[in-house]
From Swiss-Prot:
This is Putative manganese efflux pump MntP 1. Its main location: membrane. It is found in: Cell membrane. GO terms for biological process: intracellular manganese ion homeostasis; manganese ion export across plasma membrane. Probably functions as a manganese efflux pump. It holds the Pfam family Mntp. The gene is mntP1. The lineage of its organism: Bacteria, Bacillati, Bacillota, Clostridia, Eubacteriales. The keyword Protease does not apply.
Length: 183
């Protein structure tokens, strides 16, 4: 696989994480530390799941393909609903500061990387090249998500977005999850 193809593939699968990280970044209760943990979680799981998928891809390819999209879509819809319900509550701590959310969202936005590993990276016969290709995909996801956090800080300054961040982010996540399920 050429570097340009790998870059475009990494960019494409990072867009899910970018959309989710924007929604997280505009949340009022999110701290810089928490947002960076999300960034690295998303990057790590993009790497790990693409590597795992590439490593065992030829065995499970025909059984796993439809499942990741359904699971990822449902998880993102649930997180969107939780965000909206959080908007109605007056509490200090954001749902995103719950440590389990780093894992849940990291895996849910990276499930497509598992599919890419199964379908595309499984043709890489050399384990070192598979590792490096997967690492490259994780690095691209980390960079894209970092840009998403930076962008969300500017978006958060718009007063109407700041006031309704939980609702806006929740609705976007629900729509994104529905897109994953049905389109």
């Amino acid at each position: 696989m050429e570097v340009q193809e790998l870059f475009l593939l990494a960019l494409a699968i990072s867009l899910d994480a970018f959309g989710v990280i924007l929604c997280i970044g505009i949340n009022k209760g999110i701290t810089l530390k928490s947002s960076m943990i999300f960034v690295f979680s998303f990057g790590f799981f993009q790497f790990f799941l693409s590597f795992l998928g590439g490593y065992i891809g030829t065995i499970f390819n025909k059984y796993i393909v439809p499942i990741p999209t359904i699971v990822g879509g449902l998880i993102i819809i649930i997180v969107g609903i939780l965000m909206i319900t959080e908007g109605f509550k007056e509490k200090e701590e954001s749902i995103f500061l719950n440590k389990i959310m780093y894992l849940i969202l990291g895996v849910s936005v990276s499930i497509d990387a598992l599919v890419i590993g199964f379908t595309t990276l499984s043709y890489i016969n050399n384990l070192f090249y598979l590792f490096m290709s997967s690492l490259f995909m994780g690095l691209i996801a980390t960079i894209i998500c970092s840009l998403g956090i930076i962008l969300s800080k500017y978006i958060k300054k718009i007063s109407i977005i700041s006031s309704y961040a939980d609702y806006i982010g929740g609705i976007i996540l629900i729509l994104f999850g529905l897109k994953m399920l049905f389109f």
